[in-house]
Regions:
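SAM-dependent Rossmann-like transferase core, predominantly class I methyltransferases
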Residues: 1-51, 55-67, 254, 260
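A short glycine-rich, Lys/Arg-flanked "PGG" loop and its adjoining helix->strand segment in the class I
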Residues: 145-159
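Conserved beta-strand signature within the Rossmann-like core of class I S-adenosyl-L-methionine
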Residues: 160-167
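Class I S-adenosyl-L-methionine
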Residues: 170-178, 182-261
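Conserved SAM/SAH cofactor-binding pocket of Class I
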Residues: 33-122, 129-132, 137-138
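Glycine/threonine-rich flexible loop motifs
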Residues: 140-144
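Short "lid" loop at the C-terminus of a central beta-strand within the Rossmann-like core
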Residues: 136-137, 168-172
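Conserved beta strand-loop-helix elements of the APE1-like EEP
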Residues: 260-268
């Protein structure tokens, strides 16, 4: 059973102070991708001010970190799991930012209650920043939730807003380019934060399922995934090769957890 509490020290968070997150059984524990997204917020505080959205907030860690920034006035965290919402509310109180956060039970951008629908309606065109660390989606190439994040965000972001979006290295630059081609209001600017090379740990059933999905996508002619070759640092493996090597050697491929910066223009091309 995972630990029920994660503590991040002040020295990790560039002036945001120490943060503690409770994640009891049945809620989302922090992952390496979560920690990288937290580092992006801590290292790029100057980009965040005003009102924000946290898509798929889980137990609230990214929204809470953003609310520690003095220039951030409020954040709305969107989360489909009731258990996660309850823990997120407790974490906001624990970390002293409850007055700056609203947590909304929602399926993507769609709240489950009329009251919360009215709250979301009041945010249209007024959001200054969006942060999102989506999971891998199922029944597609794993990138579907990231497309959903940007598709739905257009309704809420003001012109000039910024997006911090978690996109792990293995998805490759071609998918990022395609994301901006599909949604031309968004422009990719740079990588805000990245972990060191780390195992895409196939001892985790969820990551093994992801790699199998990636291999199936490549088999259907989809865009190849990108994993560095442990045997030759100048070459890369696609998902099918990485999966075959894992079954042969038991060795997980490598990746980096990353947070990417996009900006938003309501009229593409401005």
């Amino acid at each position: 059973m995972p630990e029920e509490r994660t503590r991040l020290l002040a020295e990790e968070l560039n002036g945001l102070g120490e943060l503690t997150f409770l994640h009891p059984p049945g809620t989302f524990a922090l992952t390496p991708a979560s920690v990288t997204a937290l580092h992006a917020i801590a290292q790029s505080q100057n980009l965040l001010s005003g009102s924000g959205l946290d898509w798929g907030t889980g137990v609230g860690c990214l929204a809470i970190a953003a609310c520690r920034i003095p220039s951030v006035t409020c954040v709305t965290g969107l989360e489909i799991s009731v258990a996660n919402v309850v823990s997120a509310q407790e974490n906001a109180r624990l970390n002293g930012v409850a007055e700056k956060i609203e947590f909304v039970e929602a399926d993507s951008y769609q709240p489950t209650s009329t009251e919360r629908k009215n709250h979301m309606a009041s945010l249209r065109g007024k959001i200054d920043f969006l942060i999102a660390n989506p999971p891998s989606s199922e029944a597609d190439d794993g990138f579907g939730y990231r497309r959903a994040v940007l598709r739905g965000a257009c309704e809420f972001l003001r012109d000039g807003a910024v997006v911090f979006l978690s996109v792990s290295f293995q998805y490759g630059p071609e998918r990022v380019r395609d994301l901006c081609a599909r949604f031309p209001q968004f422009s990719f600017r740079r990588v805000l934060a990245a972990s060191a090379w780390a195992p895409f740990d196939l001892a985790r059933p969820d990551l093994l399922a992801c790699l199998k999905l990636y291999a199936e996508e490549e088999g259907k002619g989809g865009t190849p995934y990108v994993f560095p070759d442990r045997k030759n640092d100048r070459t890369f493996l696609n998902a099918r090769t990485a999966l075959a090597r894992f079954f042969e050697t038991g060795e997980s491929p490598l990746t980096k957890w990353q947070s990417l910066l996009f900006d938003f223009r309501s009229h593409a091309g401005d």
